[in-house]
Amino acid sequence: MIVWDLAVVGAGPAGLSAAYAAARAGVRTLVLERAAHPRYKTCGGGLIGTSLAAVRDRIEVPAHDRVDRVTFTWDGRRGFTRRHRAPLVTMVRREEFDDRLRAAAVAAGAEVRERAPVRAVEQDPEGVSLRLADGTTVRARTVIGADGSSGVTARHVGVRYRQVDLGLEVELEVPPEQQERWRGQVLLDWGPLPGSYAWVFPKDDRLTVGVIAARGEGERTREYLRRFVDRLGLADAPAAHDSGHLTRCRADDSPLRQGRVLVVGDAAGLLEPWSREGISYALRSGELAGAAVAEGDLAGYERAVGERLVPSMRAGYRLLDLFTRRPEIFHGLVATPPGWRMFVRFCQGRASFDETLARREVRALLSLLERIPASRRSVPTS
């Protein structure tokens, strides 16, 4: 039986980043993917600057729009639009973006095996066995799990979650006049449910329209999406895709490794808690894990995540708490020049949330706001 140096479970941005980093360093790498590229993935598909930097030397990003304008509303009211001189977010379709990452991993030397779902993970002193759906077994010295938060590797490692949200999304086909209306612009709507928001992301002849809210509010979340689409005048637009998924943010003490099995991206619960942005965390954690395997220092992956990713997640939880308790204050802050600058820096990858919140004036403001009681969840009247 072939024994691979590394087997990666899952061929999304996290898994393919791990495979690319490892294979490029000479690690004999196999990627196991349950589907076949190109495949649709429920995702807003907005790449912030941090994500663009992570793939700059790897692929040409298949951009369908570059956004420089953002309209903010609070449950459809009190809207305002801000514009920046340079693009803030790059829009991609995940089937194209992921397929380019796959090609880059293959070019680096990795083998990608598609339609190969993994059903079980077992470790022994010599390595790791992966049992596939067809009954065959793959052996590897090390495994990186990138099969999502509900996958077998997350269960094997024992990942624990602090926050679970339900995201619902429709991909709407729109005529030329709607394409022109939305070109270069996104809409973010702070929603009526605690911690919820909705978005419109333009991608040429399609609009990705979605909402996200805490799990357990399924019916109200679906109603929020329906009302949001109606309000946009898009209720009759044909849907190319209509889907949903759960996003899970890790608990602070959740493991990232069990023996010779590491988890990355969604499988590790690595994403930004306030925006639920996950692609940048997937790309970075995958690269960190692949490099750790190449260097023979698996514990180094845990250290790197703790140093480079966890601080921003902790800051994101503080922002989410303020947003959940007082969305009207959050809406007002984004309208101010300092609030807009913070948003721009986040989008362009020029400053992480922990770096921003560490500034003295921001610390003082946040400390004051955190002492304000939570508001009643009311719809704005003007």
What is the predicted function of each stretch?
Residues 1-6:
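Extreme N-terminal starter segment of soluble prokaryotic enzymes
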Residues 25, 104-239, 253, 269:
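Predominantly flavin-linked oxidoreductase catalytic cores and closely associated redox partners
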Residues 9, 145-146, 263:
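Redox-cofactor binding/interface segments in oxidoreductases and associated redox assembly factors
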Residues 291-382:
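C-terminal helical "tail/cap" subdomain of flavin- and related membrane-associated enzymes
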Residues 7, 11, 20-43:
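Glycine-rich FAD pyrophosphate-binding loop
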Residues 207, 251-315:
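Conserved mid-domain beta->alpha element of the FAD-binding
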